[in-house]
Design a protein with these regions (language model features):
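Charged, gly/pro-rich active-site loop segments
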Residues: 1-10, 89-185
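Short, basic/aromatic recognition patches
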Residues: 2-29
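Short beta-strand segments
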Residues: 25-62, 68-70, 77-81, 90-95
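A short beta-turn/loop motif at secondary-structure boundaries
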Residues: 34-38, 86, 149-151
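Short acidic (Asp/Glu) patches
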Residues: 60-64, 73-85, 134-144
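Short, surface-exposed beta-strand-loop junctions and turns on beta-sheet-rich folds
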Residues: 63-65, 173-174
Length: 185
């Protein structure tokens, strides 16, 4: 736990083990609040952009309920608890609590992204394709793209953390370490 990394725009430091989870886990569980106020959770593939201290989630337009919930109440959490495919041994479980934004702008290509974010997204996509080579059949097949155009049209969700909690070796029976992130209002 001695390896720490300074985070721009934040007066805190984040342990390397937490960053390793953000950079190596493929999925997280995104929880929003539904219309009734009850939590609703979905598996997502978040992209962490450390230079801006934000997570980005690209969700299909045809599966947009999470964006509807976020527009109603921006409080969200993301739990990184499933290390399958991460190549990390006994990794932390990490919970990110924060505020999300879900603009109603539709994206049909990733070319609109900031070049730095595009590089991060491209790296994650390549990593996913190495782990799940069958993805290429869907991503690069014109028939799949035509029949599933609703899936490839994306809404971008941005999550700005305000609290990060982590549990050693994913052991939820122990008390978590907690970091308050002060750049969120």
């Amino acid at each position: 736990m001695n390896d720490l990394i300074a985070l721009p725009e934040i007066s805190h430091v984040l342990p390397m083990e937490v960053l390793a989870v953000f950079n190596n886990f493929f999925t997280a569980e995104l929880t929003t609040l539904g219309k009734s106020g009850y939590p609703v959770t979905w598996p997502v593939l978040p992209v962490f952009w450390p230079e801006h201290q934000k997570f980005f989630i690209f969700t299909p337009a045809g599966l947009s309920q999470k964006t509807v919930n976020i527009r109603r109440d921006p409080h969200v959490s993301m739990l990184f608890s499933e290390p399958t495919g991460s190549d990390l041994e006994r990794p932390l479980a990490v919970l990110v609590q924060g505020l999300a934004e879900a603009p109603d702008r539709m994206h049909t290509s990733i070319s609109y992204l900031d070049p730095e974010l595009l590089a991060v997204v491209t790296a994650q996509t390549r990593k996913l394709m190495r782990r799940q080579p069958a993805m290429k059949l869907y991503l690069f097949n014109p028939v799949s793209r035509y029949l599933m155009d609703w899936y490839f049209m994306r809404l971008m969700i941005t999550v700005t953390p305000h609290r990060i909690l982590w549990w050693q070796a994913g052991d939820f029976s122990r008390s978590p370490q907690i970091m308050e992130v002060d750049h969120v209002v």
